[in-house]
């Protein structure tokens, strides 16, 4: 397999384009603090935060595929590329409405490899969390703000993991899935970055 094919496979398996949802709040908060110009912005903390958030998001995406296949949810979803009630103009683009990456079903990765990849992303996000912890201590001389940010990151991790993982499986509990997505991509990312 060529290098470009491997990149495309990685993008498909991880659903990398969807990480823009987690990057947007981080970039907004970073831009705000950078514009203030009163030493509240640290480029090193900002970069570490971006990578940590990306790794958490990718881990949640891959866990989502893992648990959806394991529980038979993806198999039951026959309207994977259903454009639903979209206007005719948008139907032409065959927008993905639901169903994850379908990477396991397409043979791009197997179920065990999916779990390993998700665990690897989460492990790496913890490593970045430690770097953020240390970097913030070097800048401020205090662990106070870092403990709050890491707590928020941990809550985000739990929401991402239990979005489709049993026994909680938020995505199938009448509105709790939507609430968890709102919390993870709204207040938690914004507060965690700040």
Predicted feature residues:
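Short, Lys/Arg-rich, polar N-terminal cytosolic tail immediately upstream
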Residues: 1-11
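The first (N-terminal) embedded transmembrane alpha-helix
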Residues: 13-33, 122-123
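Membrane-embedded alpha-helical segments that form the functional core of polytopic membrane enzymes
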Residues: 26-27, 38-63, 146-161
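Membrane-interface elements of multi-pass transporters and channels
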Residues: 34-39, 66-70, 74, 138, ...
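Aspartate-rich (DDxxD/NDxxD/DxxxD) Mg2+/diphosphate-binding motifs
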Residues: 56, 60-121
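Intramembrane alpha-helical segments
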Residues: 94, 99-194
């Amino acid at each position: 397999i060529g290098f470009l094919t491997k990149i495309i496979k990685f993008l498909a398996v991880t659903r990398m384009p969807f990480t823009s949802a987690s990057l947007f709040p981080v970039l907004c908060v970073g831009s705000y603090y950078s514009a203030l110009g009163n030493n509240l912005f640290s480029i090193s903390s900002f970069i570490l935060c971006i990578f940590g958030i990306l790794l958490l998001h990718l881990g949640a995406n891959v866990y989502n595929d893992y648990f959806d296949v394991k529980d038979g949810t993806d198999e039951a979803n026959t309207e994977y590329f259903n454009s639903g009630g979209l206007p005719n103009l948008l139907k032409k683009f065959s927008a993905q409405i639901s169903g994850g990456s379908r990477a396991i079903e397409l043979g791009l990765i197997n179920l065990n490899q999916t779990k390993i990849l998700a665990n690897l992303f989460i492990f790496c996000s913890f490593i970045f969390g430690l770097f953020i912890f240390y970097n913030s201590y070097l800048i401020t001389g205090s662990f106070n703000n870092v403990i709050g940010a890491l707590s928020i990151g941990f809550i985000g991790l739990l929401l991402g993991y239990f979005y489709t993982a049993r026994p909680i499986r938020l995505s199938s509990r009448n509105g709790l899935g939507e609430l968890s997505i709102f919390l993870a991509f709204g207040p938690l990312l914004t507060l965690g970055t700040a």
